[in-house]
């Protein structure tokens, strides 16, 4: 449907009989109204053409071939005998055959039928509104029990004679009382049969009760009862402050309150959406278009397979026609009641065969696939054909970790990237006069020359991509990333963003989508980038946090020698190994440490002294609280105070000349990365301010 703001949307709800007629009925050019399916036949056994007024009728659902009627005629030029709009012989309109995908029909039921979704599903909406249990309602629905029928504020004979003590009485109890109370022939002429005047059963009984509901009164009474229960509970708590409160009574009160709250919500929903409760009882049964329930012939002259829905529709039409004939011939009441029950069971099997007491089965003892089975589940119409169907500019691959990526980046395999961005790549090649036409551009892409990869990287800079991992349970199931070309066939992902996707690197797959319009790209870059979705939308906790692998890697890279400062005297390496010095090397800056590591003069865990740029020792520790472990004097009068984690060089007068801290290569690299990250964040927050160098 399209609302007043031209937003396309899909809404599932109850439809009125008038709405069902509007979906199904259409007026032919000759003024005839078609749309009602009255025959159970589908195709003729000799011609394989749809039967007239059947569940595949071309007059109701449209022609099988575009512009060709059931007779085989078409509105040719100069053919005056054939109307340009429809065929006068068979009544089929000359329209596109795609109309059979959405044109519906309807079955006019001979008796009202209760919709099984609203009766047997949990919660049962009909039982909730009528304030009864589901078992109490199943008796009247399936004609096992009968309800007394009020007629225009006039008491019925049964009620006036006191036959009914309760609203629901068994049929076996009603008949003896009634027959002994008054002869059947004493009914006034024109008052109808016993069943029509005095009692109701089946969907008619439930429909009459739903029709008489006052939703606003239900809300008011439920709210008043809920308030009384709350006051009762508080009074019981005040009286039983020192004694144990009866848990059974509390549980009964809690359940009753929950029932009242659910009933008020349901009644408010009906009022807000202008839906009548009586629409839960069907008088008109919609018939799906032929395309979702096809009949397919396997090969030339082979077997014909049909959807299970066609067989279920056939049973409904057969039983409905039987009841119509019984009512027309004034058949026996017992036969009418039994046929009403059969129609209710047939409609139940059509809508939801799995919820029935005894599901309808085929000749191979397999349950028929009902309408609910067609639309629900992973392989249903919604998830597989509407939400999960394949679309252009999308791909799919396995995810692996990408430790070299930033949080907002993802590694896109070159084979996938060149296919996803092929249209943009062709336009860029032609626009830069690298390729003269479309054919040459496609040929260059097939050859995959160096110039193609350069242009592709430039194209990808302006196009974020969307990654989606099924099932998409919240908004972080789809996030935007800046694609980076990588080798291989797997999508590379930063490990910190896996929390939002609920993904791990044990074979999980993700889908890739390319936003095309400018609005979609702007939304992806501003709202959907992973660096802007760091908190959980449900509870607000951080969701992009370091994983266990990252924490373990940081621990391994920053671990230090267990001997600490005493490694100066007792070096862990053997004295005969000349590649290691007996003393820790000293370095002036970070760059000197990393240069020595690249030249393999030291390894990742080698202990070393690194000059600290700040003279203020309060950053490191308190000088007054820690005594030096060792003091080394030099010939010029300067001396070194060796502490556990740092070394201070002082002059003759005791002034501090410089400070060296004890660290390792791994800790130096980690400190450098953290410093650059904090500096980058600070510069992005204050771009016009010159910030001092940060020390960690």
From Swiss-Prot:
GO terms for molecular function: DNA binding; DNA-directed RNA polymerase activity; magnesium ion binding; zinc ion binding. Binds 1 Mg(2+) ion per subunit. Binds 1 Zn(2+) ion per subunit. It catalyses: RNA(n) + a ribonucleoside 5'-triphosphate = RNA(n+1) + diphosphate. Its cofactor is Mg(2+); Zn(2+). Keywords: Chloroplast, DNA-directed RNA polymerase, Magnesium, Metal-binding, Nucleotidyltransferase, Plastid, Transcription, Transferase, Zinc. One of its GO terms (biological process) is DNA-templated transcription. It is an enzyme of class 2 (transferase). Signal peptide: none annotated. Zn(2+) binds at residues 69, 71, 87, 90. Its main location: plastid. The keyword Magnesium applies. SUPFAM superfamilies: beta and beta-prime subunits of DNA dependent RNA-polymerase (SSF64484). It holds the Pfam family RNA_pol_Rpb1_1. One of its GO terms (cellular component) is DNA-directed RNA polymerase complex. InterPro entries: DNA-dir_RpoC_beta_prime, RNA_pol_asu, RNA_pol_N, RNA_pol_Rpb1_1, RNA_pol_Rpb1_3_sf, RNA_pol_Rpb1_clamp_domain, RNApol_RpoC1. Its EC number is 2.7.7.6. Mg(2+) binds at residues 504, 506, 508. It comes from the Eukaryota. It is found in: Plastid, Chloroplast. DNA-dependent RNA polymerase catalyzes the transcription of DNA into RNA using the four ribonucleoside triphosphates as substrates. PANTHER family: DNA-DIRECTED RNA POLYMERASE, DNA-DIRECTED RNA POLYMERASE SUBUNIT BETA. Belongs to the RNA polymerase beta' chain family. RpoC1 subfamily. This is DNA-directed RNA polymerase subunit beta'. It comes from Pinus thunbergii. The gene is rpoC1.
């Amino acid at each position: 449907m399209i609302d007043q703001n031209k937003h396309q949307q899909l809404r599932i709800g109850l439809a009125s009989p008038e709405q069902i007629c509007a979906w199904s009925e259409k007026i032919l050019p000759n003024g005839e109204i078609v749309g009602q399916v009255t025959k159970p036949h589908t195709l003729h056994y000799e011609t394989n053409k749809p039967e007239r007024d059947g569940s595949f009728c071309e007059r109701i659902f449209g022609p099988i071939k575009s512009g060709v009627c059931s007779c085989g005629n078409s509105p040719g030029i100069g053919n005056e005998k054939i109307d340009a709009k429809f065929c006068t012989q068979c009544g089929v309109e000359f329209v596109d055959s795609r109309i059979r995908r959405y044109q519906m029909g309807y079955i006019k039921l001979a008796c009202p039928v209760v919709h099984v979704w609203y009766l047997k599903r949990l919660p049962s909406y009909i039982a909730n509104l009528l304030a009864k249990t589901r078992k109490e309602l199943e008796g009247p629905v399936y004609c096992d029990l009968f309800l007394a029928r009020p007629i225009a504020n006039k008491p019925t004979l049964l009620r006036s004679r006191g036959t009914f003590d309760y609203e629901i009485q068994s049929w076996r109890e009603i008949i003896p009382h009634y027959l002994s109370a008054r002869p059947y022939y004493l009914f006034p002429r024109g008052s109808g049969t016993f069943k029509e005047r005095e009692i109701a059963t089946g969907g008619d009984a439930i429909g009459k009760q739903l029709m008489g509901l006052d939703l606003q009164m239900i809300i008011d009474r439920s709210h008043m009862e809920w308030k009384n229960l709350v006051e009762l509970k508080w009074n019981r708590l005040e009286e039983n402050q020192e004694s144990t409160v009866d848990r059974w009574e509390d549980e009964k009160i809690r359940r009753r309150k929950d029932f009242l709250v659910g009933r008020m919500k349901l009644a408010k929903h009906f009022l807000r959406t202008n839906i009548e409760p009586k629409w839960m009882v069907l008088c008109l049964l919609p018939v799906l278009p032929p395309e979702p329930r096809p009949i397919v012939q396997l090969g030339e002259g082979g077997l014909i397979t049909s959807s299970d829905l066609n067989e279920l529709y056939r049973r409904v039409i057969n039983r409905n026609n039987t009841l119509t004939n019984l009512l027309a011939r004034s058949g026996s009441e017992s036969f009418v009641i039994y046929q009403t029950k059969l129609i209710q069971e047939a409609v139940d099997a059509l809508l939801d065969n799995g919820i029935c007491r005894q599901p309808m089965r085929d000749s191979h003892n397999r349950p028929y696939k009902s309408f609910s089975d067609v639309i629900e589940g992973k392989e249903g119409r919604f998830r597989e054909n509407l939400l999960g169907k394949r679309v252009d500019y999308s791909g799919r691959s396995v995810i692996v970790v990408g430790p070299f990526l930033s949080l907002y980046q993802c590694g896109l395999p070159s084979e996938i990237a060149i296919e996803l961005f092929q249209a943009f790549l062709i336009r860029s090649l032609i626009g830069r006069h690298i390729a003269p036409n479309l054919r040459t551009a496609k040929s260059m892409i097939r050859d995959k020359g160096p110039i193609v990869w350069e242009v592709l990287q430039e194209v990808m800079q302006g196009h974020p991509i969307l990654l989606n991992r099924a099932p998409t349970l919240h908004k972080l199931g789809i996030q935007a990333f800046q694609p980076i070309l990588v080798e291989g066939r797997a999508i590379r992902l930063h490990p910190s963003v896996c929390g939002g996707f609920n993904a791990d690197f044990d074979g999980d797959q993700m889908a890739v989508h390319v936003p095309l319009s400018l609005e979609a790209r702007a939304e992806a870059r501003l709202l959907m980038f992973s660096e802007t979705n760091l908190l959980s939308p449900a509870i607000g906790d951080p969701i992009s946090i370091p994983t266990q692998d990252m924490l373990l890697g940081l621990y391994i890279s920053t671990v230090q020698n267990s001997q600490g400062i005493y490694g100066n005297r007792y070096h862990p390496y053997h004295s005969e190994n000349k590649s290691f010095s007996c003393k820790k090397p000293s370095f002036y800056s970070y760059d000197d440490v990393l240069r020595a590591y690249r030249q393999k003069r030291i390894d990742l865990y080698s202990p070393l002294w690194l000059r600290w740029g700040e003279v203020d020792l309060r950053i490191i520790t308190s000088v007054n609280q820690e005594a030096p472990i060792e003091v080394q004097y030099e010939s010029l009068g300067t001396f070194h105070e060796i502490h556990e984690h740092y070394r201070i060089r002082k002059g003759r007068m005791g002034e501090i000349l410089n400070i060296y801290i004890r660290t390792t290569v791994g800790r130096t690299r980690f400190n450098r990365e953290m410093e650059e990250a904090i500096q980058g964040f600070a510069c992005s927050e204050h771009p016009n301010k010159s910030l001092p160098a940060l020390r960690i």
